Amino acid sequence: MAFPGNQYKLLALDLDGTLLNEKNQVSPRDAQAVRRAQERGVQIVLCTGRNVREVRAFSDQLLALPDWLVTSSGAAVQRPQDAEPQFFSSLSLTHCEEILALCEEFETDPCLYTTQSLYYGGAFRALLRHLEQGGQIVMNEADEGYFYLDSHEKWLKALESETLPFTKAVLYPSHDISDLLVSRLKHMGSFEIAPSVMFGGELHNIEINRRGVNKGQ
């Protein structure tokens, strides 16, 4: 990684599939490359769909802290040492209830993020197992901040009991309902929708933020 004449002032790095390797870690080589960029005056920004708790754990694998964290697909922006985000735009309780109702209608479940926690159901757990079979480790379910919910009633209870606002949602629908879900979500008019296809078309996911929120365009 070369930075001739300080041509670059800022380096924005995604985590999954970019900075993190198949073991869900920052390699020593990449950590050294990021540090060399910092020494040349380049600001390092970690941009990801993950929440602040997760990103801080990965930033600890770098040789020096990044300058900024853009988390939950742009819903929260802060410096690593800050207790609170400098920019924050969350989903409202009504938004979350609408997403849950849509999931119940289509017999799927979401992931819901706060800055500190991830709530997930069977669809995301199936993805984790799929990735583990291929040798990829995305997260350890036993770690602090991860909560598995296996019924609609538990989802409603989580909305009631969680004291932090939800920053984003992610759906992992089957192929046959993915396009229809995107269409319904867009029709609601309240959300920023980012559908994507992974693993050669095997997996469709839909990231949902409050309207106007994204990692950067």
Map each language-model feature to its residues:
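Active-site phosphate-binding/coordination module
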Residues: 25-138
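Short amphipathic alpha-helices and their capping/turn segments at secondary-structure boundaries
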Residues: 1-5, 56-63, 184
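Non-catalytic pre-domain segments flanking phosphatase-related domains
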Residues: 1-13, 39
